[in-house]
């Protein structure tokens, strides 16, 4: 070893010891002929002092981020020079020898200053030397270990599934890899291990998990990555409660890493209730401000805007004092989300209603509105009217925006809930409008994925009443973030074929794309279910990071590019020829 001690491990009790440290020069300071450096390694920082002789002369050439090894004696710092802000603040190392292991070029940015994301990603190896990013990756390693420990106690088997497979419709676009030995044919990188883990249940493995890399070729969305990580689990002979119980044990172990005792069992809310109360299937429960249904209240209204399939409201406490410019800003905020605007009523201090909507209401509506929505004098009532899904989504977003503007969200709080009783299907046009890929050519597509089992009461009727069919599915939400989703799976060929048919995937297409799974179901497939956790998102939450990029070693930028390596990049003509990427498919009979 090139060092005897970790820089962050030294304490006053080590005074008098000869030590060898190795790391990077975080800072260098010249004080009256004496040079001090902060020597940083993965464990922390120790102050090193160069006082005289050849070692002092050698220290003059040190610059930020030189990689060095230092020998010296641990000394207690003189009284008054201690630094209580760091664990090693009571000592310094009096250097007797200095070796430069690697010089550093001038830095593209100072590691102790804020830098732009593009620069940080381009020089990610420097960025990770900083305390925050480096700490986040080390936390991620602990997260992996904690989950593995829980799963080992429950006899789960860690199994790696293929990362080169065939392209199957799963809800997003595939990344494709040309097969050189079969020109014109392609592998696909998996969007998830879904099909393989179900096959492992058919294979009798019973309890499987994997920290899996997944790939989805999606359009640009903020804070998404084309490659990401899931903790993927599957269990045989279980129901939803069994999967949820193991999942909660994992979450409890993870949050214990940051000193939080997560009380279990976690609360549950139905999908319908979440949409009605919060306007989203990912409700942030750290604050109130629930949506209020107003359709019946305005049943006889003469105001044409409120003669809509859905009318709802959310109250902004104290919002009546907002200046006109701010209220106009809310309209622009709504338009950026695809709405025409955000109607509002202001409740005066005397209880009278003001604003452009109030004059269109009847006396009875004005008299009863504040009580109906729970508004007090001085509040602002925001409304949305129109199709239920989009209107609730607008109010749900307004609810979050109100909470942020009024500082109603406790940043130290943790609020979890399971969302259950999901619809099995949604209209394909709604999925497409939301930016998802509607699998199949039918009018209906799966809300989660095509392999989600219907709840028992919906199994016989989901193809005649798709709008009313419920899925045996469950998502886990933390602070308004979906951090995992799972379901009981279909394990019978006939049921799976009926689901495919509902989605417009007819028999021949199903056999071509999913025949291996359908065939497996004919060999005594067990009932099974599982869940996949968004590992990047969970780690970001634990690390108190706003972006998942902060907890990925070498992330892509928001547009899917890698500033560090320059990927994606063109390939050479020779690579194109060898890969067969330009090969034309053979016609029938050729």
Swiss-Prot record:
<dbReference type="Pfam" id="PF02938">
    <property type="entry name" value="GAD"/>
</dbReference>
<dbReference type="InterPro" id="IPR029351">
    <property type="entry name" value="GAD_dom"/>
</dbReference>
<feature type="binding site">
    <location>
        <position position="489"/>
    </location>
    <ligand>
        <name>L-aspartate</name>
    </ligand>
</feature>
<dbReference type="InterPro" id="IPR004364">
    <property type="entry name" value="Aa-tRNA-synt_II"/>
</dbReference>
<dbReference type="GO" id="GO:0005737">
    <property type="term" value="C:cytoplasm"/>
</dbReference>
<keyword id="KW-0547">Nucleotide-binding</keyword>
<keyword id="KW-0030">Aminoacyl-tRNA synthetase</keyword>
<dbReference type="Pfam" id="PF01336">
    <property type="entry name" value="tRNA_anti-codon"/>
</dbReference>
<feature type="binding site">
    <location>
        <position position="482"/>
    </location>
    <ligand>
        <name>ATP</name>
    </ligand>
</feature>
<feature type="binding site">
    <location>
        <position position="448"/>
    </location>
    <ligand>
        <name>L-aspartate</name>
    </ligand>
</feature>
<dbReference type="InterPro" id="IPR004365">
    <property type="entry name" value="NA-bd_OB_tRNA"/>
</dbReference>
<keyword id="KW-0067">ATP-binding</keyword>
<comment type="similarity">
    <text>Belongs to the class-II aminoacyl-tRNA synthetase family. Type 1 subfamily.</text>
</comment>
<dbReference type="GO" id="GO:0004815">
    <property type="term" value="F:aspartate-tRNA ligase activity"/>
</dbReference>
<dbReference type="GO" id="GO:0005524">
    <property type="term" value="F:ATP binding"/>
</dbReference>
<dbReference type="InterPro" id="IPR047090">
    <property type="entry name" value="AspRS_core"/>
</dbReference>
<dbReference type="InterPro" id="IPR004115">
    <property type="entry name" value="GAD-like_sf"/>
</dbReference>
<dbReference type="InterPro" id="IPR047089">
    <property type="entry name" value="Asp-tRNA-ligase_1_N"/>
</dbReference>
<feature type="binding site">
    <location>
        <position position="216"/>
    </location>
    <ligand>
        <name>L-aspartate</name>
    </ligand>
</feature>
<feature type="binding site">
    <location>
        <position position="170"/>
    </location>
    <ligand>
        <name>L-aspartate</name>
    </ligand>
</feature>
<protein>
    <recommendedName>
        <fullName>Aspartate--tRNA(Asp/Asn) ligase</fullName>
        <ecNumber>6.1.1.23</ecNumber>
    </recommendedName>
</protein>
<feature type="site" description="Important for tRNA non-discrimination">
    <location>
        <position position="80"/>
    </location>
</feature>
<keyword id="KW-0963">Cytoplasm</keyword>
<dbReference type="Pfam" id="PF00152">
    <property type="entry name" value="tRNA-synt_2"/>
</dbReference>
<dbReference type="GO" id="GO:0006422">
    <property type="term" value="P:aspartyl-tRNA aminoacylation"/>
</dbReference>
<feature type="site" description="Important for tRNA non-discrimination">
    <location>
        <position position="31"/>
    </location>
</feature>
<keyword id="KW-0436">Ligase</keyword>
<feature type="binding site">
    <location>
        <begin position="534"/>
        <end position="537"/>
    </location>
    <ligand>
        <name>ATP</name>
    </ligand>
</feature>
<feature type="region of interest" description="Aspartate">
    <location>
        <begin position="194"/>
        <end position="197"/>
    </location>
</feature>
<dbReference type="InterPro" id="IPR004524">
    <property type="entry name" value="Asp-tRNA-ligase_1"/>
</dbReference>
<dbReference type="InterPro" id="IPR045864">
    <property type="entry name" value="aa-tRNA-synth_II/BPL/LPL"/>
</dbReference>
<keyword id="KW-0648">Protein biosynthesis</keyword>
<dbReference type="InterPro" id="IPR006195">
    <property type="entry name" value="aa-tRNA-synth_II"/>
</dbReference>
<dbReference type="InterPro" id="IPR002312">
    <property type="entry name" value="Asp/Asn-tRNA-synth_IIb"/>
</dbReference>
<feature type="binding site">
    <location>
        <begin position="216"/>
        <end position="218"/>
    </location>
    <ligand>
        <name>ATP</name>
    </ligand>
</feature>
<dbReference type="GO" id="GO:0050560">
    <property type="term" value="F:aspartate-tRNA(Asn) ligase activity"/>
</dbReference>
<comment type="function">
    <text>Aspartyl-tRNA synthetase with relaxed tRNA specificity since it is able to aspartylate not only its cognate tRNA(Asp) but also tRNA(Asn). Reaction proceeds in two steps: L-aspartate is first activated by ATP to form Asp-AMP and then transferred to the acceptor end of tRNA(Asp/Asn).</text>
</comment>
<feature type="compositionally biased region" description="Basic and acidic residues">
    <location>
        <begin position="575"/>
        <end position="590"/>
    </location>
</feature>
<dbReference type="GO" id="GO:0003676">
    <property type="term" value="F:nucleic acid binding"/>
</dbReference>
<comment type="subunit">
    <text>Homodimer.</text>
</comment>
<feature type="region of interest" description="Disordered">
    <location>
        <begin position="557"/>
        <end position="590"/>
    </location>
</feature>
<feature type="binding site">
    <location>
        <position position="225"/>
    </location>
    <ligand>
        <name>ATP</name>
    </ligand>
</feature>
């Amino acid at each position: 070893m090139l060092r005897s001690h970790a820089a962050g491990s030294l304490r006053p009790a080590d005074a008098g010891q000869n030590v060898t440290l190795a790391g990077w020069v975080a800072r260098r300071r010249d004080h009256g002929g004496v040079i001090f450096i902060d020597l940083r390694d993965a464990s922390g920082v120790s102050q090193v002092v160069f006082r005289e002789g050849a070692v002092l002369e050698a220290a003059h050439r040190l610059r930020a981020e030189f990689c060095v090894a230092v020998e010296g004696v641990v000394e207690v710092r003189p009284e008054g020079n201690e630094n209580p802000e760091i664990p090693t603040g009571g000592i310094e190392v009096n250097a007797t020898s200095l070796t430069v292991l690697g010089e550093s070029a001038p830095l593209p940015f100072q590691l102790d200053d804020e830098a732009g994301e593009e620069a940080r990603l381009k020089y990610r190896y420097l960025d990770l030397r900083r305390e925050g990013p480096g700490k986040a990756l080390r936390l991620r390693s602990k997260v992996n270990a904690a989950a593995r420990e829980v799963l080992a106690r429950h006899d789960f088997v860690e199994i790696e599934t293929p990362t080169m497979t065939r392209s199957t419709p799963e809800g997003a676009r595939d990344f494709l890899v040309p097969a050189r030995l079969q020109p014109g044919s392609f592998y696909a990188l998996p969007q998830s291990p879904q099909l393989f883990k179900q096959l492992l249940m058919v294979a009798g493995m019973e309890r499987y998990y994997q920290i899996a890399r997944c790939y989805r070729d999606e359009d640009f969305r903020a804070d998404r990555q084309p490659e990401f990580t899931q903790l993927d689990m599957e269990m045989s002979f279980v129901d939803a409660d069994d999967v949820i119980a193991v999942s909660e044990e994992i979450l409890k172990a993870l949050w214990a890493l940051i000193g939080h005792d997560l009380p279990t069992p976690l609360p549950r809310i139905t999908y319908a209730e979440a949409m009605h109360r919060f306007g989203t299937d990912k409700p942030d429960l750290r604050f109130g401000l629930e949506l209020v249904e107003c359709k019946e209240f305005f049943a006889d209204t003469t105001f044409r805007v409120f003669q809509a399939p859905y009318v709802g409201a959310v109250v902004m406490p104290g919002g009546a004092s907002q200046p006109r410019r701010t209220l106009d800003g809310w309209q622009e905020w709504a338009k950026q989300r695809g709405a025409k605007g955000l109607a509002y009523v202001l409740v005066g201090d005397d209880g009278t209603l003001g604003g452009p909507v109030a004059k269109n209401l009847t006396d009875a509506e004005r008299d009863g509105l504040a009580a109906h929505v729970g508004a007090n004098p001085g509040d602002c009532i925001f409304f949305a009217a129109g199709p239920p899904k989009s209107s609730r989504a607008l109010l749900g977003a307004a609810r979050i925006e109100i909470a942020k503007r009024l500082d109603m969200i406790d940043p130290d709080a943790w609020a979890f809930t399971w969302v259950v009783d999901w619809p099995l299907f949604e209209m394909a046009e709604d999925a497409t409008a939301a930016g998802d890929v509607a699998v199949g050519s039918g009018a209906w597509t799966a809300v989660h994925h095509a392999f989600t089992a219907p709840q028992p009461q919906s199994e016989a009727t989901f193809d005649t009443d798709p709008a009313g069919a419920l899925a045996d599915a469950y998502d886990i939400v933390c602070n308004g973030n979906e951090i995992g989703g799972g379901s009981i799976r279909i394990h019978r060929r006939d049921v799976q074929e009926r689901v495919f048919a509902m989605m417009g995937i007819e028999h021949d297409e199903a056999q071509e794309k999913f025949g291996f799974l359908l065939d497996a179901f004919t060999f005594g497939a067990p009932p099974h279910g599982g869940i996949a956790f968004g590992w990047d998102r969970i780690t970001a939450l634990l690390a108190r990071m706003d972006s998942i990029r902060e907890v990925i070693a070498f992330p892509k930028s928001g547009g899917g590019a890698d500033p560090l390596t320059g990927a994606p990049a063109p390939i050479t003509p020779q690579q194109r020829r060898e890969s067969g990427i330009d090969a034309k498919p053979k016609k029938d009979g050729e």
